[in-house]
UniProtKB/Swiss-Prot annotation:
This is ATP-dependent protease subunit HslV. Allosterically activated by HslU binding. Belongs to the peptidase T1B family. HslV subfamily. GO terms for molecular function: metal ion binding; threonine-type endopeptidase activity. The lineage of its organism: Bacteria, Pseudomonadati, Pseudomonadota, Alphaproteobacteria, Rickettsiales. It is an enzyme of class 3 (hydrolase). GO terms for biological process: proteolysis involved in protein catabolic process. It comes from Rickettsia bellii (strain OSU 85-389). Keywords: Allosteric enzyme, Cytoplasm, Hydrolase, Metal-binding, Protease, Sodium, Threonine protease. The gene is hslV.
Length: 182
């Protein structure tokens, strides 16, 4: 049983199309090759739904990071980019935090960011970001669907992409939830 699979078994996708920003997550919690729960909620809204965050990795670690992010967002008056950079600095340098094994996607009206325990804050190209074991499947599907002019909304693209990821990744499922940045 690989600990790496236990820590990263999920799919989180965030995309922006026509000023609409959606973040989606599957509901599966796995430990190794065992499904512990199929209806987990891996997304959180912050600052009255103006900021949304999703995590992949250890559940306890992800929740701890949400709490730290909320504090940073309040400290920096809802400035997501500055809050993310400050969280990443703490995450990398603090003895306790640097042991946390999770990744996050956070988004507001202006930014989609990937945060890692290595201290990385990455703003992805093409207005699409994904993390977790099914992340590359969801990312590929979303980029393909967004690469040509189509009538699909951001939410429809996210749901189709997440379903493709759930079909391919055994650590992700079809219990998909979405949140929209307002």
């Amino acid at each position: 049983m690989s600990d790496n699979l236990a820590l990263h078994g999920t799919t989180i996708l965030c995309l922006k199309k026509n000023e609409e920003i959606i973040i989606a997550a599957d509901g599966q919690v796995s430990h190794g090759n065992t499904v512990l729960k199929s209806t987990a909620r891996k997304l959180r809204t912050i600052a009255n739904n103006k900021i949304i965050a999703g995590f992949a990795g250890s559940t306890a670690d992800g929740l701890a990071l949400f709490e730290k992010l909320e504090v940073k967002i309040e400290q920096h008056k809802h400035n997501l980019l500055r809050s993310a950079v400050e969280l990443a600095k703490d995450w990398r340098s603090d003895k306790y935090l640097r042991r946390l094994e999770a990744m996050m996607i956070v988004a507001d009206r202006n930014h989609i960011l990937i945060l890692t325990g290595n201290g990385d804050v990455v703003e992805p190209e093409n207005n699409v970001a994904a993390i977790g074991s099914g992340g590359l499947f969801a990312l590929s599907a979303a980029r393909a669907l967004m690469s040509y002019d189509n009538p699909l909304t951001a939410e429809e693209i996210a749901l189709k992409s997440m379903n493709i990821a759930a079909d391919l990744c055994v650590f992700s499922n079809h219990n998909i939830i979405t949140e929209k940045v307002v």
